[in-house]
Regions:
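Catalytic core and acceptor-binding pocket of nucleotide-sugar-dependent glycosyltransferases
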Residues: 48-164
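GT-A fold catalytic core of metal-dependent nucleotide-sugar glycosyltransferases
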Residues: 1-40, 45-51, 55
């Protein structure tokens, strides 16, 4: 399990992960099928099951960096994910953005939110500002009674630097 430091956990994201997946990654953009390589990965949240298959996939991923000079590891994974799935049989689960959101695709409902990643946000100050506001809103949400929460989506009200 590897994750960026700009991710808030509101609930346990392992509840959303399939035991059948060899690798699980968050998504910048999610298109409905958790196993479709058409989803765009965000390796800020990455889990890999220990196996020969995943070790081979990580080795291929590392070697592939030479074929894509100037691209960072997430961009390289995006380039080779179809090959990893079709040729190596790697089962990659892309976490849906309704439950594991980011600033790119702000789900805005605390009732369904597991994690929030400060992606699509430039600068540590901006990330800390918006994540701090979000954490304050989460605390207010947690202080609500169950009846208030069950009336529908509980949305946060923070206009931020990166969250709009």
């Amino acid at each position: 399990m590897v994750q960026d430091v700009d991710i808030l956990w509101f609930r346990n994201p392992f509840e959303r992960m399939s035991v059948a997946a060899h690798m699980v990654t968050s998504s910048d953009f999610f298109f409905g099928d958790p196993y479709s390589p058409m989803n765009l990965p965000n390796t800020g949240f990455l889990y890999a099951k220990s196996s020969r298959r995943t070790v081979g996939a990580f080795e291929a991923w590392r070697r592939a960096r030479e074929s894509f000079p100037g691209k960072h590891e997430q961009q390289v994974l995006n380039e080779i994910k179809v090959e990893l799935v079709s040729t190596r049989g790697l089962r990659i689960q892309f976490l849906d953005t309704d439950h594991n959101a980011g600033f790119c695709n702000n789900t805005r409902d605390f009732n369904t939110l597991y994690t929030m990643h400060a992606n699509c946000c430039v600068g540590l100050g901006a990330k800390l500002h918006d994540l701090g506001n979000l954490l304050r809103e989460w605390r207010a949400y947690r202080s609500m009674d169950e009846g208030e929460r069950s009336r529908g989506p509980v949305r946060w009200k923070v206009p931020g630097i990166c969250i709009h």
